[in-house]
């Protein structure tokens, strides 16, 4: 389009036409443009001119060119408008792009700031987490230590429980042993009680026998009194005959040895040593050293009343023998118990275990109790024997008094004093006869009283 304008006659706004032939009437163009009505008026005049056709053509071309130029101008204006619009659009697009870039940059800056803030917060969190990790590690270590301490305490408690259980088992075993010992002691106590009952029954039987013996002794005394009466009646008849023989009999009595005097008064009583009963089994002795002295039979010169021992006295001697045998047996049992006591003491010294020592101590206590019971039984039996011996002595004394009364009546007719001869007196007489053949009756009486005072004393 620009090229067309450049080569056109009129030219363009940018560049004028290179070759434009300006006719002579170009000077009158403005007036024509200005006064178109005049052309129409004057047209018939111009038409008659020779250049009229050329002018008309030129005018037509000019009109066309003007029309074209106007079109071009409109087109150019349109283009300018379009360009301005496009420029505005471009500006708007640029502004939008710049705005978008700015927004994107701002967003990036914000994102960077946010990321930096997040990083700082993450770092702070990391430090906190590290601190928390250290704290948790410490807590875990403390918990492990506490756990170990608790486990150790539990193990110690378990050990203590086991020790307590062992102690309980030991105590239970001791209780079982004590129960067994208690059962054994109860059985021994029952056996001892049975033995005591048996011995009490025996003692009752012996007391019954003693009562029977006393009854027999009373019967014998009545018999002796009757015999005295009979003998007194017989002695009155034979008094005259025996007066002559009295002097000879007194001489024979003085010349006789002491064993014959003892035979005159029957058997001597039992003599016991003076001793103390100790509870200690080591010092225990045999309580009786029985020395029974039997006198020999009387020679033929003595009277007929003293020739033989009566059967009642033989029975009493047999009872005394039985009692002495029983005493000896009980003393043997006591000796055996003392031997057992010594053996247990040796075992106690040899052993080291406390349980065995406790058992031996219990056995020793039981033995001591048995020995005490046995000692009491022996003392009771001795008392019974003493009572039996006293009864026997009374019977013998009664018989001897009768015999001595008859002899004194025969030997001392002038009324000398009748001294009752007891078995103890018989013993003193024998001792005095051994020392000196001549003795006084007052001295004999003093010795008799002394012996009665120094009789057997059993300390309990």
UniProtKB/Swiss-Prot annotation:
Q: Where is this region: Disordered?
A: 399-423
Q: Which keywords accompany this UniProt record?
A: Coiled coil, Cytoplasm, Cytoskeleton, Microtubule, Phosphoprotein
Q: Main localisation, per the record?
A: cytoplasm
Q: Which residues form a coiled coil?
A: 51-228, 317-384
Query: What is an example of a GO molecular function annotated in this UniProt entry?
Result: identical protein binding
Q: Where is the composition biased (Polar residues)?
A: 399-410
The question of whether Phosphoprotein is a record keyword is answered with: yes
Q: Where in the cell is it found?
A: Cytoplasm, Cytoskeleton, Microtubule organizing center, Centrosome
This protein's GO cellular component annotations are: centrosome; cytoplasm; microtubule
Where Phosphoserine occurs, the residues are 49
Q: Which family does the UniProt entry place this protein in?
A: Belongs to the translokin family.
Biological function: Centrosomal protein which may be required for microtubule attachment to centrosomes.
The name on file for this protein is Centrosomal protein CEP57L1
